[in-house]
Amino acid sequence: MSNIVIVGAQWGDEGKGKIADTLAEKADLVVRYQGGNNAGHTLVVNGKKTFLHLIPSGVLHQHTKCVIGHGVVLDPVALDEEITRLQATGIAISAENLFVSESCTIITSYHKLLDAVRESNTSEKIGTTGKGIGPAYEDKVSRKGIKFKHLFDKDVLRSRLAISLAEKETLFRDLYKVEYPTLEQEFDKLFALGQKLKQYAADTFSIIDQAIAAGKNVVYEGAQGVLLDVDYGTYPFVTSSNTSVAGVYSGATTAGHGLDHVIGITKAYTTRVGEGPFPTELFDDVGKFIQHKGGEIGVTTGRIRRCGWLDLPLLKYSAKCSNLTSIALTKVDVLSDMDTLKVCIGYKYEGREIYCAYPGIDLYKVEPILVEMEPFSINETVTKDNIPAALKTYLKTIENHVGIPISSLAYGPSREQILFFEDYFKKG
């Protein structure tokens, strides 16, 4: 058995879904442990794309059970729509393979409206997806949240809605002056959705615990990336949950269960959606080339992703924050056949050179130390025996600076275009 965590090691959009989908072939459970439908995973199988936002990437494997842990904030409208959309394409989803924690905090219409009006009424944009993620986590922490199980009980749901709406009603009416659903309108919608989705409600804590005790393979699938972690990330330009490995313990299982592998999913370059510092960002034709070739458009937001060279000081920081055991490098093919190829190995900052970022650093004030790398070309299926020499040098540069090995290499969009240097699953 193996307990494997997939963590985004950058600002999200690293290709976690692709790696999770590939590992799910040998997994018994694939578990989402934080975030919400602000995540967007793209899977490509036989040339066909599947887009996921809430449901774990194991859904394409019939034997794999998918779990949404209690650390996820759940939009029941989005979950219902995603299930319906996937079922329409022939993907089997039922109470036999999808288990949603009864303790997930629910995202309501009020959370989404509050998210939108806040972003539109501030001069300092965060770049929120507008999905209501932050306000839902606020209610969770302030003990005003609505849990998934509350949707099934009329009296409890109405009571929890009244608590949640009380403060927001004043904001909507007096501060933002926007229309909002009445309590009864929201109640009717949520209760109806609760009846429809109740079949998926489960004690996921025990499901995961029992699977581990039975020696099953469990893959924990993170959303976003370490650099968006509410504690470790580039605050305030972060998400509202713990996207690092810490989120596994707070959002799915207990610290009593050890983790065999913590894989940091990393693009061969760097991207970011929304606002915030980005030391290696490219504003020239090279950046536009990477953007176009890499198809760098957000699955959830439809926004163009900012692109830049691979940032090793930030990657090393992510590795430390999540105790990464290895790196899964993705989108290597995007850098193939480039005229110019660079990587950031350090920063000049406040009169000194540093080679690993840290929480208090002001990334707006760093000057990246860029080194020129020899361009490489990928024109065929990549095996351990035919990796181009220049690519080997690129990989070794990453390993030497970050201090952990690269355990897999993705060089195309399909699940077949991954070269594994390590078997994550224990034998026997």
Curated annotation (Swiss-Prot):
Obligatory cofactor(s): Mg(2+)
Chain segments annotated as coiled-coil in the UniProt record: none
Predominant location category: cytoplasm
Pathway(s) per entry: Purine metabolism; AMP biosynthesis via de novo pathway; AMP from IMP: step 1/2
InterPro entries: Adenylosuccin_syn_GTP-bd, Adenylosuccin_syn_Lys_AS, Adenylosuccinate_synth_dom1, Adenylosuccinate_synth_dom2, Adenylosuccinate_synth_dom3, Adenylosuccinate_synthetase, P-loop_NTPase
Superkingdom of the organism of origin: Bacteria
Residues annotated as the enzyme's active site: 13 (proton acceptor), 41 (proton donor)
Family annotation (SMART domains): Adenylsucc_synt (SM00788)
GO-annotated biological processes: 'de novo' AMP biosynthetic process; IMP metabolic process
EC number annotated for this UniProt entry: 6.3.4.4
Binding site for GTP: 12-18, 40-42, 305, 331-333, 410-412
Catalysed reaction equations from the record: IMP + L-aspartate + GTP = N(6)-(1,2-dicarboxyethyl)-AMP + GDP + phosphate + 2 H(+)
Cofactor comment: Binds 1 Mg(2+) ion per subunit.
Entry's Gene Ontology molecular function annotations: adenylosuccinate synthase activity; GTP binding; magnesium ion binding
Residues the record lists as binding substrate: 299-305
Binding site for Mg(2+): 13, 40
Annotated localization: Cytoplasm
Keywords per UniProt: Cytoplasm, GTP-binding, Ligase, Magnesium, Metal-binding, Nucleotide-binding, Purine biosynthesis
Pfam families the UniProt entry points to: Adenylsucc_synt
HAMAP family: Adenylosucc_synth
Protein family membership: Belongs to the adenylosuccinate synthetase family.
NCBIfam families linked to this entry: PRK01117.1 (NF002223), purA (TIGR00184)
Protein function: Plays an important role in the de novo pathway of purine nucleotide biosynthesis. Catalyzes the first committed step in the biosynthesis of AMP from IMP.
Subunit record text: Homodimer.
Protein name per the record: Adenylosuccinate synthetase
Classification lineage: Bacteria, Pseudomonadati, Pseudomonadota, Gammaproteobacteria, Thiotrichales
UniProt gene name: purA
